[in-house]
Regions:
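Sec-dependent N-terminal signal peptides
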Residues: 2-10
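Extracellular parallel beta-helix/beta-solenoid repeat domains
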Residues: 10-316
Length: 316
């Protein structure tokens, strides 16, 4: 009986929570422009991966990349559509197949990581349609990846946002990691309807074109004990990007904890380290989502409330 129960417990575990086979490891580490579909736990022990990696759908739940200090880098420059590592949901009939419990650990990532539910791969049709229904936040979160852990990763950004957490993604953890290189935008973007991220104990040495972390209609996140070198740019901005691409933002950037972070290199005249309510509708496209009685369609304001900001320091 005990053996039967143990077997059932193993069968009930995440489908990709098993060691990669030798054949899978060889395919993963083969240089290619074609993304490798990861359905196992890869312990690379320092071996480099020279191709994009795709972790997609419920069948990839429990998958892991443990690089042992090795590098992940595609043969071509990473883009938003073909990222270095993609953790994506997939349309499955009337619903969505989403991965959960994915880990990326001890890797050097050249390019970017994209975590997406609705809108994965650049198709905005489902996201736009869902946003025009009153239960959009719940639907987006049910469709999106959850419990993705990023531990001791060095991001070497090459222009695009190194870590994008897409609409509805929940419980993302980023710890002990370093953001370096350059981004024309931010280092981390927490997009609308996402929630529950923990960003703790990281170093931001990256040069960005704007603030380091954008909290865009994302709630209940914890950004704690990080070190930011701002190079004259902003730090952490909380807002709601009303109307962009016609998508209605339902959730507000509320109930976030931003504490015990250290900022250096802030602008002398206007040091903007943590800004709660950074936009308040001041964008030309805010009217593009007009016509519905909820979310940013009804109110262009950021609506930030219940945020805790304390213990942060600015050094020169």
């Amino acid at each position: 009986m005990l053996a039967l129960l143990a077997a059932l417990a193993i069968q009930a575990g995440p489908p990709a929570a098993r060691p990669c086979s030798t054949a899978e490891m060889n395919a993963l580490t083969q240089r290619s422009a074609e993304p490798y579909r990861l359905l196992c736990r890869a312990a690379l022990a320092g071996r480099d991966v020279r191709r994009p990696v795709l972790i997609e759908g419920a069948e990839a739940s429990g998958a892991a990349l443990d690089c042992g200090g090795g590098r992940i880098e595609g043969p071509d420059e990473a883009t938003t559509r073909v990222p270095t590592i993609a953790v994506w949901s997939r349309r499955d009939g009337a619903g969505w197949s989403r991965p959960s419990g994915v880990t990326v650990r001890d890797c050097r990532v050249t390019g970017n990581i994209r975590i997406w539910g609705m809108g994965a791969g650049g198709s905005m049709r489902d996201l736009l349609a869902s946003s025009r229904t009153p239960g959009h936040t719940r639907a987006a979160q049910a469709a999106a990846p959850t419990q993705v852990r990023i531990e001791r990763v060095r991001f070497e950004a090459t222009g695009t946002i190194p870590l994008y957490v897409g609409p509805g993604v929940t419980r993302t953890t980023v710890t002990g990691s370093t953001f370096a290189g350059r981004s024309t935008s931010t280092a981390i973007y927490l997009d609308a309807e996402s929630a529950g991220a923990e960003i703790r104990g990281n170093v931001f040495a990256i040069r960005t074109g704007r603030e380091q972390i954008a909290v865009d209609g994302s709630g209940a996140n914890r950004i704690v004990d990080n070190r930011f070198a701002l190079h004259g740019q902003g730090g952490i901005f909380l807002y709601r990007n009303c109307g962009e691409d016609g998508v209605i933002r339902h959730q507000t950037p509320s109930y976030n904890q931003i504490t015990d972070n250290v900022f250096s290199g802030a602008a002398w005249l206007r040091p903007r380290t943590v800004v709660v309510g950074a936009r308040e509708g001041r964008r030309r496209y805010c009217g593009d989502d007009a016509g519905w009685p909820f979310g940013s369609s009804a109110d262009d304001g950021d609506g930030a409330r219940g945020n805790r900001v304390s213990g942060n320091r600015t050094t020169r």
